[in-house]
From Swiss-Prot:
A GO-annotated cellular component: cytosol
Pathways per UniProt: Carbohydrate biosynthesis; gluconeogenesis
Enzyme Commission numbers on file: 4.1.1.49
Cellular compartment(s): Cytoplasm
Complex and partners: Monomer.
Lyase is among the record's keywords: yes
Cofactor(s), by name: Mn(2+)
Principal location listed in the UniProt entry: cytoplasm
UniProt similarity note: Belongs to the phosphoenolpyruvate carboxykinase (ATP) family.
Protein name according to UniProt: Phosphoenolpyruvate carboxykinase (ATP)
GO molecular function: ATP binding; metal ion binding; phosphoenolpyruvate carboxykinase (ATP) activity
């Protein structure tokens, strides 16, 4: 049994006093009772749905609040954190010690004299590189969320649990002094890397706790040479590991969920001396337009112990997954064992031999697959390119490019080149190959079919792409296969999908200009400057 007196003393050391009761690492059964009990009001209230899962609302915060994210500027962070600047804006805004202390006082005062849920878990399936996390909250469903998302310790591990990092969630409190303190709003998500504490105020969005710890793994791991990556990962029957990087909507979850392979994880991973390991103990899946037919694994994972966020629940308790009236970002969190085809008992495997960058190019320029050199790997990893189609009033659809460093700029705490260095070093040691896979559009105006994309992924994973005869795509100087089994050869060179190849040329020059302009911010150090040659040249 965990010594609750010890836990109370540790809470007092944080500034949380006169706690009425500590509900320590509650069971799923207990959480279910707590979040559905009569008398709960507002966003604390859980609603039982016909799926068996409980649904909650997070109010106006239906996604992360990057504008309210701050990191304390001190001796430890001043020269290590990738701070926002005029030339390279990001979400790492500095906060002084006095402001931090006032926010900490607000949160600890909010949590004092309350009945609290304290959940201890691990971030990272690697014993050597994990962070022991303690989450303190007064809200039952928030305790449920972190029980789903972090790795659940055994009874034995809980006996002597020493937290490396504490998340204090004070979602009910806001900051009245934000204007004088020069902050963005009354809400805050603040980190102190010296005290190893995250404070949350004002926002009820569950993902702040998950992505907050991801940002911290992104700080601590690369500094000791361990990869920290925004990617999904799976492993084949022979132990061959593949990792899939990609921004939202590029196919990261869909393509890594493969009946022929076991899932390691769907979102956050590390790469250490043993191999690839999941940071999480659960999945946080989008549910908008979810159907059993299209995503059977996720659909079937929504049952008792899963937690739905911001979905529309009908009067009979059924869920309308097509209703995005609260937000398009409807979500479900569930423990990873709700998915059948997973790596057990620990979500980790050997070194990755295939590294896949997914992009959905709405410009119709990039090839469906290309093999990258080590320099190109760094260049396209730092660029983190994808493009969306946005409708205009005349009915013309124009592509909007997105460049997100390392396919996850919102969560990077160090300079992007540090992640690229670690990735390429790990890849070289493992003899891994990198591929750029475009799941977007080509000259036909249609999106590349999921059948062809799956054929491409199969060719990468079974090694047949290595035997293919290769050509080169000009401007980008990318190596592209001339034929692949099960894939329409007519699409492999994007120029061939245009009736007029000059059209591809002009679009390629346009996209090149955007890549070049975006990459300027990385040319501030020698490594960055050296990579310019690996990018496209008009």
């Amino acid at each position: 049994m965990t010594d609750l007196n010890k836990v109370v003393k540790e809470l007092e050391a944080l500034g949380i006093y006169d706690v009425k009761e500590v509900v320590y690492n509650p069971s799923y059964e207990q959480l279910f009772e707590e979040e559905t009990k009569p008398g709960l009001e507002g966003f604390e209230k859980g609603t039982l749905t016909t799926t068996g899962a409980v649904a909650v609302d997070t109010g106006i915060f239906t996604g992360r609040s990057p504008k309210d994210k701050y990191i304390v500027l001190d001796e430890k962070t001043k020269d290590t954190v990738w701070w926002t600047s005029e030339t390279a804006k990001n979400d790492n805004k500095p906060m002084n010690q006095a402001t931090w202390q006032s926010l900490k006082d607000l949160v600890t005062n909010q949590l004092s004299r309350k009945r609290l849920f304290v959940v201890d878990g691990f971030c990272g399936a690697s014993e050597h590189d994990r962070i022991a996390v303690r989450i303190v909250t007064e809200v039952a469903w928030q305790a449920h969320f972190v029980k789903n998302m972090f790795i659940r310790p055994t009874e034995e591990q809980l006996k002597n649990f020493e937290p490396d990092f504490v998340v204090m969630n004070g979602s009910k409190v806001t900051n009245p002094n934000w204007k004088e303190q020069g902050l963005n709003s009354e809400n805050f998500v603040a980190f102190n890397l010296t005290e190893r504490i995250q404070l949350i105020g004002g926002t009820w969005y569950g993902g702040e706790m998950k992505k907050g710890m991801f940002s911290m793994m992104n700080y601590f791991l690369p500094l000791k040479g361990v990869g920290a990556m925004h990617c999904s990962a799976n492993v084949g029957k022979d132990g061959d590991v593949a990792i899939f990087f990609g921004l939202s909507g590029t196919g990261k979850t869909t393509l890594s969920t493969d009946p022929k392979r076991e899932l390691i994880g769907d979102d956050e991973h590390g790469w250490d001396d043993v191999g690839i390991f999941n940071f999480e103990g659960g999945c946080y899946a989008k549910t908008i337009h979810l159907s059993e037919e299209n995503e059977p694994d996720i659909y079937r994972a929504i049952r008792r112990d899963a937690l739905l966020e911001n979905v529309v629940v009908r009067s009979d308790g059924s869920v309308d997954f097509d209703d995005g009236s609260k937000t398009e970002n409807t979500r479900v969190s569930y423990p990873i064992y709700h998915i059948d085809n997973i790596v057990k008992p620990v979500s980790r495997a050997g070194h990755a031999t295939k590294v896949i960058f997914l992009t959905a190019d709405a410009f119709g320029v990039l090839p469906p697959v290309s093999k990258l050199t080590p320099e190109q790997t760094k260049y396209y990893f730092l660029s983190g390119f994808t493009a969306k189609l946005a409708g205009t009033e005349r009915g013309i659809t124009e592509p909007t490019p997105t460049f997100s460093a390392c396919f996850g700029a919102a969560f990077l705490t160090l300079h992007p080149t540090q992640y690229a260095e670690v990735l390429v070093k790990r890849m070289q040691a493992a003899g891994a190959e990198a591929y750029l896979v475009n799941t977007g559009w080509n000259g036909t105006g249609k999106r590349i079919s999921i059948k062809d994309t799956r054929g491409i992924i199969d060719a990468i994973l079974d090694g047949s792409i290595e035997k293919a005869e290769m050509g080169e795509l000009p401007i980008f100087n990318l190596a592209i296969p001339k034929a692949l089994p099960g894939v329409d050869s007519a699409i492999l060179d994007p120029r061939d999908t245009y009736a007029d190849k000059a059209q591809w040329q002009s679009k390629a020059e346009d996209l090149t200009g955007r890549f070049v302009k975006n990459f300027v911010k990385y040319a501030t150090n020698e490594e960055g400057k050296a990579l310019i040659a690996a990018g496209p040249k008009a």
